[in-house]
Amino acid sequence: MTEQRKSLIKLISAVIIILLLPVLFFRFIGDDPTKKAVNSTRQIAVVNEDTGVLSDEVKSDEEDKSAQFGKEVAAVLGERPDYSWTVVNRSAAETGLASKKYDAIVYIPSDFSKNILSYDKDHPQKATLEFSIQDNLNAVNKEKVQRELEDAQKTMNKKMSALYWNFVSQKVDNIRGEFDKIVNKESEFQNVMYNFYKPSSNDLAGEIKQQKDLIDELKKSMNEAQGTTKEKASTAEEAKNTLKEFIDTVERYKEYQENQKKLLLAAQDSTQQQIRTGLDAIQAQQKANQFSERMSGLATGIGQAKTQIGLTNLALNNAEKLRQNQVPLQEMGMKKIENDMFNAFLSRYKSQYEAIKYQNLNQLQENIGKNRLSLLKPKESDEKEDGEDTSDNKDDTDKEDIEDIKLDLEKQRDELKNVATEIKDISEGLKEPEQEKPTTPDAEEPSTDDSPNTEEPSNDIPTSDDQPTNEDTGSSEEGTQDNGSQNDVQTNIETGQKHQESSKNVPEQDTNTENTGTSKTDFSLIELADENDGSNQSDGLQGDGADGETDISGAKKRLNEAAIKLEEIENALQEKQEEHNNKLEKHIDELNQEIKELNKTVSKLNDQIGDLTKKLVDFDNNVNDAYRLIYNLEDEIIQTLQSRGYIDQKEKLSSIFSSRIETDNISNLMKYYNSLNLYKSTLNDNLDLGSLTIIKGEVIQEQDGNVQSVLALTPEESASWEALKNNTMQTDEDINSFIDGMTKFADDYSGYIRDSQAGVLDELTKISESAAKASEQLVTGATQESATFSNDGLSGTMALSVQDTVGQEVLQMSDMMGSLSDRQSGIIDYTTNMQQSVNDVQAKADTLNNNWGKNVASTKLVRNDVYGILGNTLVDGQNNGYVYDYLANPLKISGEVPEEKIQTVPPVVILVIVLISSLLIGYFSSYYQNAPLLVKGALFGILNILVGLMISLFGLNIYSLPDDQTIKWSVFTILLLVASSAFIRTAFRFGSIPGWVASAAMILFYVAPLIDLIMPNFTFEDPVSKVYIDIQYGTGHLFTMGITVLLIITVIAVALPLIIRLMAEHTAESDETYEA
């Protein structure tokens, strides 16, 4: 594949990537990235478990006599527009809450209505509502649900207040009905009394008058009867005189006797008729007399009732006047109490607020001082102490391990010292030969062999660093000298001793090296002894004299003994060496395992160190920002204290703020910043609504006694009402006693009439019997006289005696009639008195009726006053809801509410894809900057136009706009892409470093709006976002300015490379000309 084809493939791949990038980006972010996920259903379940309560004041249906306020509350909640309130049972509500169907549940308990109607009890209970919010809601939706529940609580309180006032008006309505009943009963009583007295008195007067007329007629008849009796008596006298002449004229006497008989019979019939008439009149007169006697007691009772009613009327008038006079006094008292209450409330609240504010400032000032001290002394000692403890523990552990693996060679060291001393003695006892040693290969071999043997122990003896020491080197050099093998052995032994001493202070040893070194040291000593022995023998053979041989043999013997001791030492060392090697191997395994773990830990710590380094940089930046915020807040507090005149607090805080902050502890910084915020908020706080409500309640509670004293009944009014009550009770008692008297009077009058009638009937019976006897005697006399005359046996004496008897009977009857006439005269007088009493009773009944009418009028006035209380709550028998709403919420807050501003968010999605695409196009154009101008321009223009159109089309799916604004949006997006990519291309024209700096600047320019949206304390005025927002939400007047600026930037970015190229060519031509 040629380079040209590779370049073509690269070009096509880059173009495809640039064109596919917007498609992939918009597919990655989704169709509607600005849509907020809502996890709330905006439905609240209401569980109504209210059982209701019976109440006389509640106007309920005939079927349901109980008051159920849970239904009222559910109906009110159902009218709220923001959330859907559904009434369900408990199980359905809890199931819906678990399945996320409802955002919350409101429980109305079973005693809800009962607690609401307990307002007139000694200890009223508040009606409570319980609610449960769904746990899966986010913080925003939970806050919305809580706010909705709080608003619902206000609505329910308003409804409950209206219901309370409804109950009050219903009670007042019941009182009105009771007053209507009282007025009606009093009116009925007045009518009954009037109907009782007026018609009965009139009828009674008429009957008495009629009875009086009858009695007059009876008296007249009795007088006539008495006159007739007297005539009859005179006639009897004449008959007696006539009888004396009877003898003379029998015929005259017979005729006269017949006439007398007729006259007496007629008189007898007339007298009997008059007696019957008189009997009826006497009965009526007796009734009238008895009624007149009893009516005198009735008149007395009515007089007492009249007096009592007069007192009652007087008491009512006094009470009415006193109550009317109390009205202006009560109004003045209420106004005074309101003013006093308001003034007391303001003064107390101001004083309490200032005291609390000053106290809070002092407390917060102390907290600021304490927190500021914590910022001056960073807490590093604890960490150091922890580190030191850890290192100490580690050192202790290492020391313990070293003690465990330390090799105890003290005994062998002592034995080696003894052997070394003996060998030294042997070497001193030996005499050196006087002749020179021949230099042969055999003589040089021991030294050659000794050198490595000597060096090996020095290198292999265990040390702390596993390195050979200088003493080892010295010992090896000494082993190569020709001063004698005894010195070599002694030197090697001393070297071994020094290495053994150094091993006591070394924490780590190499097991294999130590074993090898120790064994080689021992064998080298034995070999040295043998070789020295051999060399001495050879020297002795070459030398002369027997003394040399004796010394050598003795030395050899002693060296053999030393060799035996060395073998024993070697065996002991071998045993300890094996034991020590086992411990070392075990310890080395443990150390290897620890090393592996430490390596892992180190790798993890390296990663953490990298992360912590990044975090440390961010932390330093955050700490610097925190310092700056704290210093600014301190300056604001000092300025506020200076402006408000808090000099003492200003001086104290200035001394506290004068020190510098020298800590990196975020917790202490946050505490200190929180203390400063609390101090600032407390200093700037003006009113506390919570304490305002509490103080208001306290002041109102204190003024309750004054209000009660103003509205309560005064002693005079209470006495008046008590007198009215007593008078009314006395009136009732008088009326009851009057009724009892009337009943007793009727019973007594009935008995009296019966007795009187019995007496009159007895007298009339006697009169009738006398009249019958007289009539019988007359008849008998007439019969006897007829018989006598007929029988001629009549004598004058008999007639005279008969006439005398008749005369006596007539006189007796005349006397009885006179007595009856006298009694009738008494009845007439009694009837006249009774008629006068009846007339007086009528007058008194009229007076009673008038007084009782005044009482009814006073009661009607009271009724009108009662109807005036909350009279507007009922209209045509229906509740006036407007009045109840007014009573529940008498205050109205009016004011202008500023319109909610539409939150304008820049199109961050467009900015991000424009940034990425412009960077890629700029990199691509700079990469092919050596291509022909037409090719570069075509590729640059086509890519910008295609990518810009794609970004605009996909962006319009997210940000919907009208047609004219759509064109502006697309044009501005394409020009923005062209200007950005041209800027990058031009920057890379000057070199890679300017190109990358320009890229970083452009990234910062496009990312700054995102930071502005996220960080509340960061502000960046982005001109590109302003143009987009103006096109999206405004009138588009910034479009022209934005297009102009982009065109200028594009022309400069495109023309600048051409100008630089022309200048470079011109400079090159000048140089060539100059060189030529």
UniProtKB/Swiss-Prot annotation:
Compartment(s) of residence: Cell membrane
Record membrane topology: Multi-pass membrane protein
Primary location class: membrane
Region (Disordered) residue spans: 372-404, 423-552
Keyword Transmembrane helix among record annotations: yes
Residues in coiled coil: 552-622
Family from the record: Belongs to the EsaA family.
Biased composition (Polar residues): 449-495, 503-522
Protein name stated in the entry: ESX secretion system protein YueB
Compositional bias of kind Basic and acidic residues: 423-439
GO cellular component, one term: plasma membrane
Superkingdom of origin: Bacteria
UniProt keyword terms in alphabetical order: Cell membrane, Coiled coil, Membrane, Transmembrane, Transmembrane helix
Membrane-crossing residue ranges in chain numbering: 9-29, 904-924, 938-958, 964-984, 995-1015, 1040-1060
Cited function: Required for YukE secretion. Probable component or regulator of the ESX/ESAT-6-like secretion system (BsEss). Bacteriophage SPP1 receptor. Essential for the irreversible adsorption of the bacteriophage.
